[in-house]
Design a protein with these regions (language model features):
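N-terminal nucleophile
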Residues: 1-305
Length: 305
């Protein structure tokens, strides 16, 4: 269960949010339920939000202030034990510790594993030293940790027990001015996207301002649908769907929930081909409109042309 991401650098908060969102869009399994999201703000103060259900999409309107260069999140299925803050530890001016599996379990130090790693950091240990100490001293505990310090140093690792699993997710990139690490398990991906490679690419592009091979678009509000000789989607500069053309001879028909963003559809922006849909969106189709439905993910992945 669970995915954890920590990042440092330009727009670290956005990078983490988009990393979890991309995991929800591209993956299936233990995702899209509870979320804990933490940042060290522009003053180094620890700020945290959490929710039990709905995944990162439910934080879509979260007001992320500028100046955040240190951020972390943990997410999995819904309805985890309260308080959700136990799953992600943070301290003003010091850093954040997230993870996957059960990072809040009590370890050999008598503290929760994530809090114990944070305490080691407070005593002067680098993040990778703090994480290695926890995994070495608790080899059969069911956890992996990612620690990020306020100065940008990142450490991550799994216990020996977790490392024996055959469903692990791990991707990272650490450089002087920016870095991130992502750990997860029990999440299975769309093969067209090279799974976690695409997610890491999206995170890195946000951290550094570089271009990614893929991007996330959304049917965030009702969009007009028309009969067309070929499928197409038009999006705006922010990735929102402006209109959809359908060559499917079944439509128009009775109103209902169906695939309105279809895998392989060409995506257009400002009269230029922007890319190709990698994932689908199911929504209510009727009265000439595709309307997002609360029971379905409304974001979708696009491979750039």
């Amino acid at each position: 269960m669970t995915v954890g991401i920590a990042a440092y650098g330009l727009e670290a908060g956005r990078a983490v949010l988009e990393g979890v969102l991309a995991t929800e869009v591209l993956g299936r399994g233990s995702i899209g339920g509870f979320v804990v999201f933490s940042v060290l703000d522009e003053h180094g103060q620890h700020q945290q939000v959490s929710l039990q259900c709905g995944g990162i999409t439910a934080l879509d309107d979260f007001d992320l202030r500028p100046g955040v260069r240190c951020a972390a999140a943990i997410s999995s299925g819904p309805n985890r034990p309260e308080p959700l803050s136990q799953f992600l530890a943070g301290r003003d001016g010091l850093g954040l510790v997230t993870g996957h599996r059960l990072p809040q379990r009590i370890g050999s130090s008598g503290l929760p594993l994530n809090s114990s790693a944070l305490e080691r950091m407070a005593q002067g240990h680098a993040p990778h030293e703090a994480v290695q100490s926890e995994t070495k001293e608790n080899p059969e505990a069911d956890f992996g940790l990612i620690a990020v310090a306020a100065d940008g140093k990142i450490g991550f690792g799994n216990s020996a027990r977790v490392q024996r699993r055959v469903d692990l997710l791990e991707v990272s990139r650490l450089e002087k001015e920016a870095g991130f690490a992502m750990l997860g398990n029990s999440i299975y991906f769309n093969n067209a996207c090279r799974d976690h490679v695409a997610i890491g690419d999206l995170i890195w592009s946000r951290l550094t301002g570089s271009s990614s091979k893929n991007f996330i678009a959304k049917l965030g509000r009702p969009a007009p649908v028309s009969v067309s000789e070929e499928d197409w989607i038009e999006i705006d500069d922010d990735g929102g769907v402006l209109g959809i053309g359908r060559a499917d001879p079944w439509w128009p028909a009775a109103e209902g929930i169906t695939s309105v963003v279809y895998s392989g559809m060409p995506v257009w922006r400002n009269s230029s081909l922007a890319g190709t849909c990698l994932t689908e969106v199911f929504a209510t189709l009727g009265n000439g409109l595709a309307t997002p439905h609360a029971s379905h993910q409304y974001h979708f992945a696009v491979r750039r042309s």
